[in-house]
Regions:
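Acidic/His-rich structured neighborhood in mature extracellular/periplasmic domains
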Residues: 87, 92-122, 142-203
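A contiguous strand-loop segment
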Residues: 15-113, 153, 352
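Short, basic/low-complexity N-terminal boundary segments at the transition from targeting/disordered tails
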Residues: 61-74, 131-144, 269-283
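C-terminus-biased signal that marks the final domain/tail of proteins
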Residues: 14-29, 37, 42-43, 141, ...
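Bacterial N-terminal signal peptides
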Residues: 1-8
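Compact, glycine/acidic-enriched structural inserts
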Residues: 45-63, 105-145, 330-342
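Surface loops and adjacent helix of pleckstrin homology
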Residues: 33, 173-174, 183, 311-313
């Protein structure tokens, strides 16, 4: 299975939801899901040391694009191939994530004469994590490269970058032009574009946290059926615009937790609401993969304390990778599957 097959085969199965939370101790947490119902993504975590050199794929799936060497060490989570890091954090606290963006982005056409500065969209996260420490540096680095697709059938993607200062930006490439947007809200999903998603929030200006007050409607007394009716009308489907709205409201109404650890746990709790069952994405009776969930993994990244947390469709226990415990000047490149076993463990309860 190749990335081209993944993102061209069934666009309706590709989804991602990202949120941002701030802790009372000033820790910054970015968290996200990644969905794909067509096949197992064979995801891995990778540890990339300083000085490690990679080369980009180009159309035809050959490793003949630009070469890039990591100035900073980083940890990333990949899909399908270890080179395709779609979420990661580097030792300076820069976070980067790739989100599907079908139907709205357009990269420039690949030009073989520019291959030494051409990089595939699925390796851009790796390049920027290894090269940059701030969002301003990300902007400058993107100007120097040509972002291309490996496969002309492929969906495009867009990206979220956040640095230690708290600034977060979104990158979308439309008509071959890189467009950056400040993301003060800290939410990202998929298509349409980020500006449209932010404008669409205005359609839900009537929503609020809490419960609607009882009042008279003529001679009839009306009262809410239950708590939380201030959110009545929030969209509940799994399309990107609906997920964007829900993520925005769930994130902004969540009570601030005192610590980074509490905020990480809160991020996972919020993102529970965005898990996508396999069956709803395809026609009735059509099954594309023997996997337990279309939401294949969820991550929360503590940018301040430099720890990546993740859980998967096979194991909902939360695991962590602490970048502070990695010496990026001495370690070797390493990659391993996110799961050692592909089955949710059951833990017996001692009854006496």
């Amino acid at each position: 299975m190749t990335i081209g097959m993944i993102i061209s085969g069934h666009q309706q199965t590709t989804a991602c939801t990202g949120i941002t939370l701030n802790a009372g101790d000033n820790a910054r947490i970015v968290a996200r899901t990644i969905e794909w119902g067509g096949s197992e993504l064979n995801s891995r975590y990778v540890i990339v040391p300083r000085g490690y050199t990679q080369r980009s794929y180009i159309p035809g799936y050959t490793l003949d694009g630009m070469s890039f060497t990591a100035k900073y060490g980083y940890v990333g989570l990949s899909v399908e191939q270890k080179e395709f890091v779609v979420e990661g954090l580097n030792e300076t606290g820069l976070s980067a994530g790739l989100f599907y963006f079908p139907g709205y982005g357009q990269y420039e056409e690949y030009d073989a004469s520019l291959k030494d500065s051409s990089i595939t969209d699925f390796q851009l996260v790796s390049y920027l994590l290894g090269s940059c420490s701030t969002t301003d540096e990300v902007k400058e680095a993107v100007k120097k490269v040509h972002v291309i697709a490996i496969d002309p059938r492929s969906s495009t993607v867009h990206w979220r970058f956040a640095d230690a200062s708290g600034r977060q930006i979104v990158l979308e490439i439309v008509n071959g032009e890189a467009r950056f947007y400040d993301n003060k809200l800290g939410v990202l999903t998929n298509s349409p574009g980020f500006e449209w998603q932010m404008t669409n929030l205005n359609n839900y200006v009537n929503l609020y946290s809490g419960t609607a007050e009882a009042h008279k409607f003529g001679d009839v007394q009306l009262a809410s059926f239950g708590a939380g009716s201030g959110f009545l009308g929030i969209p509940g489907d799994v399309t990107p615009p609906s997920r964007f709205v829900r993520a925005a409201f769930f994130q902004t109404t969540a009570p601030k937790q005192a610590t980074a650890a509490g905020t990480v746990r809160q991020a996972f709790q919020i993102l529970n609401n965005f898990d996508i069952p396999v069956g709803i994405e395809f026609p009735a009776g059509e099954v594309h993969a023997d996997i337990p969930s279309a939401t294949q993994w969820t991550t929360a990244t503590d940018m301040t304390n430099k720890v990546i947390y993740y859980r998967t469709m096979y194991d909902s226990s939360i695991r962590s990778i602490d970048l502070n415990k990695i010496d990026f000047t001495k370690c070797k490149y390493f990659n391993a599957p996110l799961d050692k076993t592909k089955e949710q463990p059951f833990i017996p309860v001692k009854t006496r």
